[in-house]
Amino acid sequence: MSAMRYPGGNFAAGFHWRDGVGPRGDRPAVRELAWQSVEPNTFGTDEFVALCRKMGWMPMLTVNLGTGTPEEARDWVEYCNCPVGTREADRRAANGRSEPHAVKLWCLGNEMDGPWQLGHVPAEHYAIRAQQAAKMMKDCDRTIETVVCGSCTTSLPTWMEWDRQVLEHVGDAADYISLHRYAGNREDDTPDFLAVTAAIDRQIEEVDAACRYVQARRKSARRALLCFDEWNVWYKATGGDGQGKRAPHLIEEVYNLEDALVVAGFLNSFIRHADVVKIANIAQIVNVIAPLLTRGDGLLVQSIFHPFEMMAKRRDGVSLRVAVDGPSYTGRTNGRVPFVDASVILGEGVLHVFLTNRSERAAAPVSIEPADASIAGLESAEILTGPGPKAANSFEHPDVVAARKFDEVSVRAGRARLKLPPLSMAALSLRVG
């Protein structure tokens, strides 16, 4: 991972950053309204930034524009980014951090178009709030970049109209606009579930079209880019009421093979749209709808971890346009898609190819033919598959769905060939000359 977003999420609309700084013994425990739990504030800004530095992540902070104010957001920028000599920077120094945290990415609230959100307001009201916050925050530190709240789901009646109004009002103060999507198979329709990639592609392209429209309408040299700062599979684990407990177990989804293939589809879509999708954050990372589950001191690697890991270690390079020529099918709600989903990254002397076979029954013969290069050999290849679409890992059986070395790739006459098993995902690194 390269960036980490904190503190969320619906949590952000009730979080006041000053509660989470200073000596831990002096920090207040507060009732957290989004998830109906108790927040002890023992982990706050300084702990988060320290964790990011330790892990090599870029910190990304979400200001409270639900129950908070633009001034509170500005003060948080001062606390994090300004040299000592003023009130909030001196507060940071008094808390043991004399050097600025230099946080570059700032989200202007979370899902403010959602009626469930604390402080939800219509688009025109949020746009004023966001514009005020962005101006004050950038006046405090002109190097930061801001993410305005876009439509968090295509199902709300304000879809696209919210984005237009916000972008038109906030203008060039918005560096990015956010998108969210959680995919699910509530109808137990595996082919349609796996075709959700088509809907992800459409969502990205429609929001980008709104950004281009506003850029043209405003006659601006700048255009907001896309920040897909919440995405995942989520539909089996329900209920978000913590019943007033501290650190309750909430929405701990168990993921299976088809979920992992959908996660691969999300990532393929992001790579294909890398010219406009510049930031993407899976939600979450541990326990709550997460690739990793814990039990006591035990750790379970869930199925969705594997495509993320297989692709992350091959992420460096330039996204290439990919054309898939082969059979297709029509999902019940998501539309027509090829059986093979693909994305490609060109690194230094290496071509990284990511392939998913959506078919439940048929293996897919694949020939990889670069337009302006020749494949010289296979550097590495992995495949992810399992005994069936509902196969899942457990603490008792942790490797039911797991990645393994893939030897069935041949290179001949500048092309690579393989046969992709049903319901599988492959990641290849091919030397090119």
Residues of each region from the PLM?
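Conserved, mostly hydrophobic/aromatic
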Residues: 52, 76, 106, 177, ...
